[in-house]
Amino acid sequence: MTTGQFVLQIVGITEAQLLSRPSLKYPDVDGLSDIKILKDNREMVAHTPSHDCDGLAETGLEILVAPCPPDEYDDDVLEAMNGETFTHTIFLTILREINEHKNDPKPPKPPKPVKYKKSNDPLVIEESGSDLSDDDDDNEQFIAINPKIAIEVMESAIEKHLMEKLPPVKQFKRNIEIKLEGKVDSTFSFVGFCTDGVPFIMEVNNVPFAEYTHGSRVRTDKSFYSKTAYFPGKNCTNTAEMIKKIKDLTTIKTESVTRCLLAYVVERTDIDRLEFSAYNNEYRRAVRRAVEHGVEIVPLVISWTKEGVAIYVTDKLPVVYPAL
């Protein structure tokens, strides 16, 4: 897997400003916002499937939107619009952090630590470690907050064989319902067969959330790139549905040879670990049990550009497992 590999591109992406969430025209519809397209100052109502997204989709923020007609999952929003419709959807939000001390004089760096190794030659000295980022630059992140985009990203990642925990795939389909009478009844993101003949099931989650201090981790240095990515968000409204899928996935794993995976598409690069949300102990417990029974966690980190291009970064982000 090569860092920097192209994954996909959102067609028609353009800059906008989020004027009001929820929309002033539809104040009771959480999935709609008022936005302004910056290139021509057009104002319109846009679909906002991420809702507030732990502060990443709030009034006043810069965002990236694209034309996106409604699909079958937007029926509730369309019904609330009383026959009207939307033409654009919010896909990414723009996060900027300014390093106010980047031009300050810096003290001299201490010498690098050294380690010794024995070889056929006389004892030699070998430098170890590498310089850590000093956060000299500002932090600018284009973060995919539309939960639907994680499925598109993962589909491309599967096709390009970007994940070590999932061998090359021979065939697969999206949104497959699996029923085992009295045991399992869930629709999973992907179901298919690997080239080694072993079936796999994957449930995909979108992870735009991150904090400097999360759970038991307290940061004082707050390097821009030391945040903890977490899932689910603080205001999660579908915990029961997600836990049911995790339990069903766990059941399938315990009763078959199927590769069962929980995938987390981390939509930003200013993080150094993934943790299951300290704001949702029910979800944490379900994940812990799943992992204990052999379900695998796949953390896929994606970097986005202003042009809506998704770039593969890594599938080896350290994961903090629940310890409840």
Give names to the regions the model predicted.
Residues L24-D34:
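Short aromatic-glycine-enriched beta-strand elements
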Residues N41-L56:
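Beta-strand/loop nucleic-acid-binding surfaces
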Residues L8-S23:
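Structural detector for short beta-strands of small beta-barrel domains
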Residues R268-L324:
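Domain-level recognition of nuclease-like catalytic cores that cleave nucleotide substrates
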Residues V204, A210-E211, S216-N281, V301-S303:
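Nucleic-acid nuclease catalytic cores
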Residues K102-G129, S133-E181:
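Acidic-basic catalytic patches of nuclease active cores, encompassing PD-(D/E)XK
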Residues S23, E97-N103, Q141-K148, M163-R217, ...:
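Active-site metal-binding core of divalent-cation-utilizing nuclease and nuclease-like domains
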Residues P22-L24, S50, A66-E79:
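Short, charged beta-turn/beta-strand-edge "cap" motif at the junction between a beta-strand
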